């Protein structure tokens, strides 16, 4: 099913398009959380710290692929809005080969640098063995991440967010079932948790690839080398590379913060591992809504529907802020029972540190909600460079303040937690100022 976001009622079309994306990411988070929950409850604190640190690293690596796919998807949306089938096919071909080459290079580099990661991330000796074992397996799933995100980006670009949801649902259920079997039934340890995730990733990646190639003839142009055009390759590199930089800079900053967290030992590492999963789960719907909003803006920008863009922007701000207020209240109130889901009740220090993190971050979700809308807006309007600027402001502030504040004995680790909302606020102010100064030019 295709959804034309240039014709349907503005708010209704955004919500109907966003809901399957939100549900899909909920499932994605479910199979990320499955690793954390099962490892934390059945393998202990050190294993939880290992998987948590490995997850942060994998998020950085896969963000490179995700950014390339998101940038290409914005261009696909514009071509769909313009009804330019020939240009769409050429963009598909150029993007597939470009992102596939990056994926192969990234996969080789990951294995080559595996043993050097311990020093870079400052991983304690008691955690490294489990972390290395987990990473060695999980790196094998990087090609599957490319397949799923590439074909999902095409489907979403033409307004179909339901099919990616279906494949993700199958993958999530399979991952949780395999997690339980491998970790608890077969005693495979952290390697079993990683194996479950990789198998599930290939099911969703190969499945969506086969479906899309069979259902949409224009996608088969990815195999036609004659469709490669120098101009199209330059377009893809321009759009996707800047979005990739935005995503990878964001996650590189988080990875640097992870290294700082690791220096505080296994208790803080375990608290951070669990709290970050809760945090991501809480604001994930508004992140997906920002991506849906971006597709809406891109299609209408391609169709030159400036009034719909303005109406969509107003509607998106109201929806996003309303959600953030509600979820902030819930996370603040239920921080302790949420931590208890992931951590054994006897680990009181871990739970206490996680609660402190959640109550600080959770109070400021409106900041990240606004930032996701700004990312989506500038990406859709062909200004991905501005998204990079906002990311540098947000993450640069976060990393700098985290290292500065945590070095003060009276503040310590809580300085890392406070650096996050401060970074969001500064990036929001930067993005809003730019929009106000360039509004006529942007929406022309």
Q: Which residues are covered by each model-predicted region?
A:
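Small-residue-rich hydrophobic transmembrane alpha-helices
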Residues: 48-108, 145-164, 271-335, 368-390
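Short runs within selected transmembrane alpha-helices of multi-pass transporters and secretion channels
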Residues: 69, 138-156, 164-172, 193-208, ...
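Small-residue hotspots at the loop-to-helix junctions and early N-terminal turns
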Residues: 45-56, 135, 194, 266-281, ...
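Short alpha-helical transmembrane segments in multi-pass integral membrane proteins
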Residues: 1-18, 76-141, 185-241, 297-364, ...
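Hydrophobic transmembrane alpha-helices of multi-pass small-molecule transporters
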Residues: 60-63, 175-179, 205-209, 281-284, ...
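Transmembrane helical elements of multi-pass membrane transporters/channels
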Residues: 16-35, 137, 171, 200-204, ...
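Helix-terminus/linker motif at the lipid-water interface of multi-pass membrane proteins
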Residues: 26, 30-49, 118-125, 181-188, ...
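N-terminal transmembrane alpha-helices
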Residues: 5-43, 56-71, 75, 100-107, ...
């Amino acid at each position: 099913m295709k959804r034309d976001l240039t014709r349907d009622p503005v708010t209704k079309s955004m919500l109907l398009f966003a809901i399957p994306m939100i549900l899909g990411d909920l499932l994605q988070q479910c199979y990320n959380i499955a690793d954390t929950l099962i490892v934390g409850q059945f393998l202990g604190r050190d294993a939880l710290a290992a998987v948590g640190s490995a997850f942060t690293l994998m998020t950085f690596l896969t963000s490179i692929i995700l950014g390339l796919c998101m940038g290409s998807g914005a261009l696909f949306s514009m071509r769909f809005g313009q009804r330019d089938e020939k240009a769409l096919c050429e963009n598909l071909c150029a993007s597939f080969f470009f992102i596939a080459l990056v994926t192969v290079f990234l996969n080789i580099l990951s294995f080559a640098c595996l043993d050097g990661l311990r020093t870079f991330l400052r991983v304690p000796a008691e955690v490294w063995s489990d972390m290395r074992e987990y990473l060695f397996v999980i790196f094998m799933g990087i090609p599957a991440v490319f397949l799923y995100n590439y074909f999902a980006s095409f489907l979403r670009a033409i307004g179909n967010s339901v099919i990616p949801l279906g494949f993700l649902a199958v993958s999530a259920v399979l991952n949780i079932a395999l997690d339980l079997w491998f970790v608890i039934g077969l005693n495979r340890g952290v390697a079993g948790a990683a194996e479950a995730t990789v198998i599930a990733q290939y099911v969703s990646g190969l499945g969506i690839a086969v479906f899309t190639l069979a259902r949409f003839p224009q996608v088969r142009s990815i195999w036609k080398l004659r469709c490669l055009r120098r101009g199209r390759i330059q377009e893809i590199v321009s759009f996707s590379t800047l979005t990739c930089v935005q995503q990878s800079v964001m996650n590189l900053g988080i990875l640097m913060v992870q290294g700082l967290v690791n220096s505080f030992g296994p208790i803080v590492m375990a608290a951070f591992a669990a709290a970050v999963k809760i945090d991501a789960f809480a604001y994930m719907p508004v992140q997906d809504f920002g991506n849906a909003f971006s597709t809406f803006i891109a299609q209408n920008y391609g169709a030159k529907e400036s009034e719909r863009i303005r109406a969509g922007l107003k509607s998106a701000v109201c929806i996003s802020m309303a959600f953030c207020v509600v979820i902030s209240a819930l996370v603040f109130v239920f921080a302790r029972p949420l931590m208890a889901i992931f951590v054994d009740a006897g680990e009181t220090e871990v739970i206490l540190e996680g609660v402190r993190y959640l109550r600080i971050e959770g109070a400021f979700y409106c900041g990240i909600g606004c930032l996701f809308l700004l990312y989506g807006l500038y990406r859709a309007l062909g200004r991905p460079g501005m998204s990079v600027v906002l990311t540098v402001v947000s993450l640069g502030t976060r990393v700098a303040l985290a290292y500065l504040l945590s070095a003060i004995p009276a503040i310590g680790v809580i300085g890392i937690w406070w650096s996050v909302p401060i970074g969001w606020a500064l990036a929001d102010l930067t993005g809003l100022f730019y929009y106000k100064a360039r509004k006529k030019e942007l929406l022309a």
